[in-house]
Amino acid sequence: MRILEAAHIPYTCLEYAWDEDHLDAVSTAQKLGIEPETLFKTIVMISADNEVFVFCVPAPVSVSLKKVKSITGKKIIPLKLEALQQTTGYIRGGCSPVGMKKHFVTYIDETAQLYDHIYVSAGERGRMLCIAPADLQAICAAAFCDLTEAAAE
């Protein structure tokens, strides 16, 4: 949040009760009383040549590997959970696209632009940031792209 304050980017921080069994983004949206489509989970992926990518997608959907291969030009897979903290500085359920250990190429699903504000992790379990999509894009030097496929019903 210091990064946002230093850049004079407005945001609101929301807190919620969390537990190990309900760390998923849809459960978090329910706890906050917000539409799941406005809560963007942070997915960290890696290519065969160890390039790390960050994707922010709405809670109810999944990253389309076909689409991200088309966007990045690389076949990528999710980063192993054991490597998440060492790579990003964050843990599962508290991984924010803002303030990672290093700058990684970041993409935000284009649906974020439909909302005045979206929610992303504040970098720790139990805290979410409410931020304008354009401000998130600016602070992360991200691109808006079509990244998702509908979640299996």
Regions inferred by a protein language model and the residue ranges of each:
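Extended, low-hydrophobicity, polar/charged segments
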Residues: M1-E153
